[in-house]
């Protein structure tokens, strides 16, 4: 009989298995906690949406829409797309459920997988994990600064240090049309290929975001948006920077920054980490004052960010750090016999009720095999129980780091374990 073939994860789609999955969860939860502390409520979004939502909201000239989306027809012949980013879906939900007609700003956070058909490379996956926030309904530079500070606090709370915040302004409706004309005039004088020229006609900022060396060299002297800001847009940007200074959030103004989505206006920012090489971005975002109206809602402003969980894990690794503990449990039970197993199963459940993570050696292993399993679990303590312990009414507690072992009465084992672990 031939052996059945096996399967692998799709190209560019990572698995997270223990112990690495523990770090992934710690990073995701750490970034989410920073948003929760700032009053952002959780929103759960569909994995797929109407394709038109992203075409209209993200921008048809972007690489995301033109090259990277997973789009297909469902059984009802409707065109749907696996979500490539979170903001458009959040705005759709806010409009659909009338959240924009309540207290403003609407502050929401989300976490989960997003999908882009990119060339797989280190930290750049086709299924990427993000934590994001959106603050909708108030055009206030102080809110811009708060959103940025939440992201900064999320990274620092995980112990990440070697990152920097780059920030710029993409202007407003007053100054962007004039700048667009000036930039197109510059670009059309260059020997651009047909595809790049087409992009310059639709959205010339996309050309400044081109990663090809020859295009970057040709556009090195392109006019900059920061030099063409209206008085209102400049005042807004200056106030954002003043708030960041007051909050103690360090930044670098990068006048050449262009984000990969078309909806950004005014404040735009990115967090980068040089330990990741060419793919240095670990998160970013900005203000999108026209997006809600573009999607059929009220003309309300908004600002948000998306932080890469996968890339933050890699950034921590580049600094020789990990987030959280990779241990599966804190206590590992080693039963020596069936009666001991029955008693340890009960003790384990009682410890779990106290919030202590506990696992057991199942499968009638010998002492040697059970202790090896205890060491591999990453637990701090092993509970050892044999016939003699049962007869004496005691349980052995072994410190797996030092090898020291003590015996305590069965009645005191819960309290003693809790005291040792500080639970």
Curated annotation (Swiss-Prot):
Pfam families: HGTP_anticodon, tRNA-synt_His. Its EC number is 6.1.1.21. GO terms for biological process: histidyl-tRNA aminoacylation. Keywords: Aminoacyl-tRNA synthetase, ATP-binding, Cytoplasm, Ligase, Nucleotide-binding, Protein biosynthesis. GO terms for cellular component: cytoplasm. One of its GO terms (molecular function) is ATP binding. It is an enzyme of class 6 (ligase). Gene3D superfamilies: Anticodon-binding domain, Bira Bifunctional Protein, Domain 2. InterPro entries: aa-tRNA-synth_II, aa-tRNA-synth_II/BPL/LPL, Anticodon-bd, Anticodon-bd_dom_sf, His-tRNA-ligase, HisRS-like_core, HisRS/HisZ, HisRS_anticodon. The keyword Cytoplasm applies. It comes from the Bacteria. It catalyses: tRNA(His) + L-histidine + ATP = L-histidyl-tRNA(His) + AMP + diphosphate + H(+). Its main location: cytoplasm. It is found in: Cytoplasm. CDD domains: HisRS-like_core, HisRS_anticodon. PROSITE patterns: AA_TRNA_LIGASE_II. Belongs to the class-II aminoacyl-tRNA synthetase family. NCBIfam families: hisS (TIGR00442). HAMAP family: His_tRNA_synth. Homodimer. This is Histidine--tRNA ligase. It comes from Rhodococcus opacus (strain B4).
């Amino acid at each position: 009989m031939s052996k059945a073939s096996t399967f692998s994860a799709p190209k560019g789609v990572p698995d997270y298995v223990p112990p690495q999955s523990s770090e992934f969860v710690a990073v995701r939860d750490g970034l989410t906690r920073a948003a929760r502390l700032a009053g952002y409520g959780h929103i759960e979004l569909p994995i797929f949406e109407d394709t038109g939502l992203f075409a209209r909201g993200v921008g048809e000239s972007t690489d995301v829409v033109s090259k990277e989306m997973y789009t297909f027809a469902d059984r009802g012949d409707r065109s749907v797309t696996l979500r490539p980013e979170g903001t458009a879906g959040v705005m759709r939900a806010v409009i659909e459920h009338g959240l924009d007609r309540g207290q403003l700003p609407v502050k929401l956070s989300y976490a989960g997988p997003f999908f882009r058909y990119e060339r797989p490379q280190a930290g750049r996956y086709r299924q990427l994990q993000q934590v994001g926030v959106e603050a909708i309904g108030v055009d206030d530079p102080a809110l811009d600064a708060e959103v940025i500070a939440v992201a900064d606090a999320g990274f620092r709370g995980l112990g990440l240090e070697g990152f920097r915040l780059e920030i710029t302004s993409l202007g407003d409706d007053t100054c962007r049309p004039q700048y667009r004309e000036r930039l197109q005039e510059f670009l059309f004088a260059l020997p651009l290929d047909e595809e790049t020229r087409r992009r310059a006609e639709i959205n010339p900022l996309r050309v400044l975001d081109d990663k090809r060396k020859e295009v970057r060299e040709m556009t090195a002297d392109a006019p900059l948006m920061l030099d063409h800001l209206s008085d209102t847009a400049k005042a807004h940007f200056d106030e954002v920077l003043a708030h960041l200074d007051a909050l103690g959030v360090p930044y670098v103004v990068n006048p050449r920054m262009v984000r990969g989505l078309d909806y950004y206006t005014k404040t735009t920012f990115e967090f980068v980490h040089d330990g990741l090489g060419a793919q240095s971005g670990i998160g970013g975002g900005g203000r999108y004052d026209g997006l809600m109206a573009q999607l059929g809602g009220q003309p309300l402003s908004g600002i948000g960010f998306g932080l890469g969980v996968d890339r933050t894990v890699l950034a921590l690794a580049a600094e020789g750090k990990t987030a959280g503990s990779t241990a599966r449990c804190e206590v590992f039970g080693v039963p020596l016999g069936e009666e001991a197993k029955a008693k340890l199963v009960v003790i384990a459940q009682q410890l779990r009720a106290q919030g202590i993570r506990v696992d057991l050696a199942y499968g009638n292993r010998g002492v040697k095999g059970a202790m090896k399993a205890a060491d591999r679990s990453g637990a701090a303590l092993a509970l050892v129980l044999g016939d003699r312990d049962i007869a004496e009414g005691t349980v052995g507690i072994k410190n797996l780091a030092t090898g020291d072992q003590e015996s305590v009465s069965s009645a005191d084992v819960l309290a003693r374990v809790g005291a040792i672990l500080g639970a």
